[in-house]
Amino acid sequence: MSPAAGVPEMPALDASGVRLGIVASTWHSRICDALLAGARKVAADSGVDNPTVVRVLGAIEIPVVAQELARNHDAVVALGVVIRGQTPHFEYVCDAVTQGITRVSLDASTPVANGVLTTDNEQQALDRAGLPESAEDKGSQAAGAALSAALTLRELRARS
């Protein structure tokens, strides 16, 4: 899988000692399981041995579980997929999840990386899921972003 246009190369991270929480939905299980596998691989490659993994039914449940994980973790990864349908439900769910994840991150001063795919169709989600035939791996990218932000915050807080 070659990097998509505009996606930065993730540097190798030494995140040993970082407490990582991952919340992943179960709707569209093939996609969410692949996102989770990508996040776990980045965590392991970065020295995070046992991230806390919590599965929830749908994307709308992600923010409240991310909030709980943020209480005792240094970083959180939120993974899921919302695929556009024929009703405005897509917009409501996407907005609520995105705003919820952002609020949790700011309120807890803990990075919560948004790896929730919001796509027009299932193929777009599959293309981003980190499967062998996928163009991108948003689970890996989200985990890398969360760990990188946690290390940056650790460094900034050590200066205070």
From Swiss-Prot:
Catalytic site positions: 89 (proton donor)
GO cellular component entries: cytosol; riboflavin synthase complex
Coiled coil segments of this chain: none
Top-level lineage group: Bacteria
EC number of the protein: 2.5.1.78
Binding-site list for (2S)-2-hydroxy-3-oxobutyl phosphate: 86-87, 128
InterPro entries: LS, LS/RS, LS/RS_sf
Binding site for 5-amino-6-(D-ribitylamino)uracil: 27, 59-61, 81-83, 114
GO biological process: riboflavin biosynthetic process
Catalytic activity from the UniProt record: (2S)-2-hydroxy-3-oxobutyl phosphate + 5-amino-6-(D-ribitylamino)uracil = 6,7-dimethyl-8-(1-D-ribityl)lumazine + phosphate + 2 H2O + H(+)
Transferase found in the keyword field: yes
Family: Belongs to the DMRL synthase family.
Quaternary assembly: Homopentamer.
Protein name: 6,7-dimethyl-8-ribityllumazine synthase
